Amino acid sequence: QYSNELDLALLKIQKTHAINRLPFLELSNLRKISIGDPVLAIGHPEQGGFWTLTTGTISSLIENFQSIPGKDVFQTETSINRGNSGGPLIDTYGDIVGINSMIARKGKNNVAITDINFSIKSTVAVKWMNSVGHPFHYATPKVTYKNETDSIVDNAGIVPVPKQDKIPI
């Protein structure tokens, strides 16, 4: 099934003996996403032949994008191209927060612009799946033994550096 307005499609995977071993990511219910949050986009550029991982942040939260009711999107400067359009926009917890879908190349009066990309919010995809007869239920949050939410940033060993005051020259 396909939604032309939302640019979403639902694909059926044929059952095989390996179906239970397919890796997957969870869809986020977006309880904690906000402007400035880091995100990742995964893709496969058409001409490059390599898988790519690009990083960026949530720049803006937009409701009813292009005047289409329910088409809520994130604006992100995460690099989106034809190779990762349709792929996941992932938060630091490894959950899908959006589906990469649109790239703005030109502004008013044909002025060239870069790094203005849009991803449909995962909650929009879930509402659409439910509306076409494929009910979806969110998974429970992943919790570690410390009772803290498990984060990709934590698992990667990335240590945040505190902001420091600038030293006058």
Tell where the protein language model's regions lie, with residue ranges:
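Conserved active-site neighborhood of the chymotrypsin/trypsin-like protease fold
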Residues: 1-49, 70, 135-140
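Short, conserved catalytic or interaction motifs in soluble domains
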Residues: 4, 63, 87, 101
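Extracytoplasmic
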Residues: 4-8, 20-22, 34-35, 51-58, ...
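C-terminal cap/linker of serine protease catalytic domains
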Residues: 17-21, 45-46, 96-167
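Catalytic nucleophile loop of clan PA
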Residues: 79-100
